[in-house]
Amino acid sequence: MNTEQFVIAYDVEQDRLRAILPDGFVSLRPVLRINAEIQNGDNGYIEFNTAVEKDGIKGWLNIGYWNGVPFERKGKTVTFRTDFLDISFTGVGIKGACPAEKDNSGCYFIEDTIRLRKPEIISSDKEFCDCEFRWTLSENNAHGKSIGKTLPAVPTEITNIYPKEEFTVINAAEIPCNQVLGAYVVRFER
């Protein structure tokens, strides 16, 4: 399957992430990630994840995913627009790599059981992007815009203990974006 994968990572308050994670998962970094894909040129797909560790295995925890997502191309910009998220990526022509790939054993999906999907081996170059996003599930949702460079997601010590909340897309989308850490697109055959 021909795949264009657009990825954005953004910094959030790590204590807010800790408050929504299911039991058994530990937050690795104060980051939320949106993966938006165009599959075979006509199907849009989005995943929403956060970096975690479970039983000594580091990876991503899927918060939600959607298939059949509408998208539009205008020049170098690709926009995914739904009733819950507006996100656009514009390639800037600079190639690079993603630092989060170094400790990624896959992506956990919580279904009837917890399933770990192994990471894909992608050797294609990544093209950095300018990116802007806005969750639209409620008026308090996260939004942000990239600043033209890639920044690290630095783990933080616990400073605030928040009441436990349900692990849902709505609760994760309400955690404010402090800063977009980076965005890229990679094209590959799946």
Task: Kindly give the residue locations of the regions a language model identified.
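Structured soluble/peripheral alpha/beta segments that form catalytic or ligand/cofactor-binding pockets
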Residues: 1-16, 20-128
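Interaction-surface and assembly-scaffold signal
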Residues: 74-190
